[in-house]
């Protein structure tokens, strides 16, 4: 692989606000450098100190890091704890039971407040109900539920009894849900009658029924249903149970199941570049430590904060910065069921004012869509709302382009709130590279520097460091507590995916092209180096989308690539070969719509191609390999400048370039 060219040269820089810096957990760059030096000088001692200070251990650990079976690293292995106890009981026992844990705003604007004592009681009742259904330590429970207090309760209840949860985003199809139910070997499924978003409903229970009917889910003995809307649903006696009926008679006391630090807290599926989704397995101790620690560092968390992460609990951001991180700190957070544009595009800004949000964390995709709305209508512009409570704002899910960063800084942060542009992944468990609000001078479009203890680097294809200013591959040189432990059921795929022999087998491969600034050493993410697409902050495997297209009766072959998109960051572009002659004009437009809807049904709406082009063939080498780099150029509307000497059918390029 040749060196990646860096084309972004950003010179604007913004210092942390003086008042915030003075009171920050990490105050000033000397404090940051001191922590980073502590980690470099005594790596195990650094992590041991954080783990002892940050978590409540039922049985203290004596071992910190076991590297004997690398890359299957173990952290705090002989220690015992419980995630739910750390998120709930210890705050109640400390006298903070009446502190508000969650301010929940429903799609229709209804607001519910739940204290730590209330949440502990609800989690305990549901945990007792799960135990009565025979669910316990080591079982896997799939959760397919809307954004809700009940979703948090379900996750925490699983953690309380030692069951491993696997949350599936509510936008996924029956087929995608079935794949995850089968792969994880779920014994129970927790879902809802319907999901309410943007004034519309989605029939989650019927999708769940369809997923189970697809087969391979014989282990699922219980389907527990949260009644969200009261909508009509099919009912399967013995298997289906109402959540509210199950918990009604249960005790609000449930002794936590103490588990080893390496016990799997959850398995979360993320797309791979080769077909089958990857079940990313996370531990209890190391993961929870980092969820809490990054709240304190990245968001400078204070007991007086009202934190709001706009993610869904179906993604890792919702796990770490809704279900676990804020609660592990004992904080108050806003949880939102709806979408940023309903009933209008001022919803986020109104909620910040209504709930006096102090720390706001959202995705660049949301920001870009709200910029468009705000510029078209002053009524939904941030300037029309009271955002004075904000002190820190952040971004997650994908790199944010400098123009959107500056708009966010000016109109939402009011030029006084630092932006924490966070880089991390499902596999990393929590933030890895990010500004610190009271220490790091920020630069639009850059995630700046690694957190203390995170040994990130940019290397070439042989694993050798590249000089600052030259693009390369982002890696992490040493294990960290919150890291992925394995891919569920596929340890060989884990090693090949994240610790490839090409890089020596000891460097964690992030899969992002990255460059470090020549002067500051700041990291800037340049995009994925493999074929995983990042659409609205969601990672989607091209192979999954291609497989969905080819499963349609009219499709013979398909290739999917991404292209830059102002709203979603990256858009899905599909090149399709039919089993019959290539359609044109209105026929092509109608069939493209049919195939978009088909992909939405097979995978979920997020995977629908924005552009479908029909060709008589795909550009292939003589050995039959699809030349995706050429398709990427065509998708972007660029002239083909690459070597096409190995191309078997050069004329197809002109045909695919002409089709829109």
UniProtKB/Swiss-Prot annotation:
Sites bearing N6-acetyllysine, chain numbering: 625
Keyword 4Fe-4S: no
Molecular-function annotations in GO: acetate-CoA ligase activity; AMP binding; ATP binding; metal ion binding
EC number(s) recorded for this UniProt protein: 6.2.1.1
GO biological process, one term: acetyl-CoA biosynthetic process from acetate
Residues binding Mg(2+), per UniProt: 550, 552, 555
Annotated GO CC locations: cytosol
Coiled-coil segments on the chain, per record: none
PTM characteristics: Acetylated. Deacetylation by the SIR2-homolog deacetylase activates the enzyme.
HAMAP family: Ac_CoA_synth
Keywords: Acetylation, ATP-binding, Ligase, Magnesium, Metal-binding, Nucleotide-binding
Cofactor list: Mg(2+)
UniProt xrefs under CDD domains: ACS
Name recorded for this polypeptide: Acetyl-coenzyme A synthetase
Residues binding CoA, per UniProt: 197-200, 317, 536
Signal peptide: none
Function: Catalyzes the conversion of acetate into acetyl-CoA (AcCoA), an essential intermediate at the junction of anabolic and catabolic pathways. AcsA undergoes a two-step reaction. In the first half reaction, AcsA combines acetate with ATP to form acetyl-adenylate (AcAMP) intermediate. In the second half reaction, it can then transfer the acetyl group from AcAMP to the sulfhydryl group of CoA, forming the product AcCoA.
The reaction(s) this protein catalyses: acetate + ATP + CoA = acetyl-CoA + AMP + diphosphate
Organism: Burkholderia lata (strain ATCC 17760 / DSM 23089 / LMG 22485 / NCIMB 9086 / R18194 / 383)
Residues given in the record as ATP binding sites: 397-399, 421-426, 512, 528, 539
Protein family per UniProt: Belongs to the ATP-dependent AMP-binding enzyme family.
């Amino acid at each position: 692989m040749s060196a990646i060219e860096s084309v972004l040269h950003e010179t604007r820089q913004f210092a942390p606000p003086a008042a915030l810096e003075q009171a920050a957990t990490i105050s000033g760059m000397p404090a940051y450098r001191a922590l980073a030096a502590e980690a470099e000088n005594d790596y195990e001692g650094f992590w041991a100190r954080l783990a002892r200070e940050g978590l409540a251990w039922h049985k203290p650990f004596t071992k910190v890091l076991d590297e004997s079976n690398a890359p299957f690293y173990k952290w705090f292995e002989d220690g015992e704890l419980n995630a739910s106890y750390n998120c709930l009981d210890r705050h109640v026992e400390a006298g903070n039971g009446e502190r508000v844990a969650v301010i929940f705003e429903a799609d229709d604007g209804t607001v519910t407040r739940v204290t730590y004592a209330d949440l502990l009681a609800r989690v305990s009742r549901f945990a007792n109900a799960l135990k009565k259904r025979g669910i316990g330590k080591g079982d896997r429970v799939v959760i397919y539920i809307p954004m809700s207090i009940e979703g948090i309760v379900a996750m925490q209840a699983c953690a309380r009894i030692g069951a491993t949860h696997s949350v599936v985003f509510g936008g996924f199809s029956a087929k995608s849900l079935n794949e995850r139910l089968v792969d994880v070997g779920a014994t129970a499924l927790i879902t809802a009658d319907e999901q309410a978003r943007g004034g519309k409903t989605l029939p989650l229970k019927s999708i769940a029924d369809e997923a189970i009917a697809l087969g391979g889910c014989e282990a699922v003995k219980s389907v527990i249903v949260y009644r969200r809307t009261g909508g009509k649903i099919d009912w399967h006696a013995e298997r289906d149970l109402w959540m509210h009926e199950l918990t009604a008679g249960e005790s609000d006391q449930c002794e936590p199941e103490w588990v080893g630090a390496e016990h799997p807290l959850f398995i979360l599926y993320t797309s791979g570049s080769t077909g089958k989704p990857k079940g990313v397995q996370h531990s209890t101790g190391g993961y929870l430590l980092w969820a809490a620690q990054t709240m304190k560092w990245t968001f400078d968390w204070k007991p007086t904060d009202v934190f709001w992460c706009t993610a869904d609990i179906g993604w890792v951001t919702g796990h770490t910065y809704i279900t676990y991180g804020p609660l592990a700190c004992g904080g108050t957070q806003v949880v939102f069921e709806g979408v940023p544009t309903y009933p209008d595009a001022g919803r986020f800004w109104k909620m910040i004012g209504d709930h006096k949000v102090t720390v706001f964390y959202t995705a660049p995709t949301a920001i870009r869509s709200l910029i468009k709305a705000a510029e078209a209508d002053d009524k939904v512009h941030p300037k029309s709302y009271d955002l004075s409570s904000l002190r820190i704002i952040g971004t997650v899910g994908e790199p944010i382009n400098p123009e959107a960063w500056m708009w966010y800084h000016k109109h939402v942060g009011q030029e006084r709130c630092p932006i924490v542009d966070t880089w991390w992944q499902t596999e990393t468990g929590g933030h890895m590279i990010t500004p610190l609000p009271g220490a790091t001078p920020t630069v639009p479009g850059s995630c700046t520097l690694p957190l203390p203890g995170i040994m990130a680097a940019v290397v070439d294809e042989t694993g050798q460091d590249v000089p600052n200013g030259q693009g390369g591959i982002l890696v992490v040189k040493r294990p960290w507590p919150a890291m992925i432990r394995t891919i569920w059921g596929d340890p060989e795929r884990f090693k090949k995916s994240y610790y490839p022999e090409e890089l020596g087998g000891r460097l964690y491969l992030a899969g992002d092209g990255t460059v470090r600034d020549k002067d500051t050493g700041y990291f800037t993410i340049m995009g994925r180096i493999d074929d995983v697409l990042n659409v609205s902050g969601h990672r989607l495997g091209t192979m999954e989308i291609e497989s969905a297209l080819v499963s349609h009766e009219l499709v013979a072959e398909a290739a999917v690539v991404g292209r830059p998109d102002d709203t979603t960051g990256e858009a899905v572009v599909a090149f399709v070969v039919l089993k019959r002659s290539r359609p044109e004009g209105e026929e092509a437009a109608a069939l493209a719509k049919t195939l978009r809807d088909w992909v939405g049904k097979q995978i979920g709406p997020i995977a629908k191609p924005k552009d479908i082009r029909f060709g008589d063939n795909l550009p292939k080498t003589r050995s039959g390999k699809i030349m995706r780099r050429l398709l990427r150029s065509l998708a972007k509307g660029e002239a083909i400048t690459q070597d096409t000497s190995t191309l078997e059918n050069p004329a197809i390029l002109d045909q695919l370039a002409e089709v829109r």
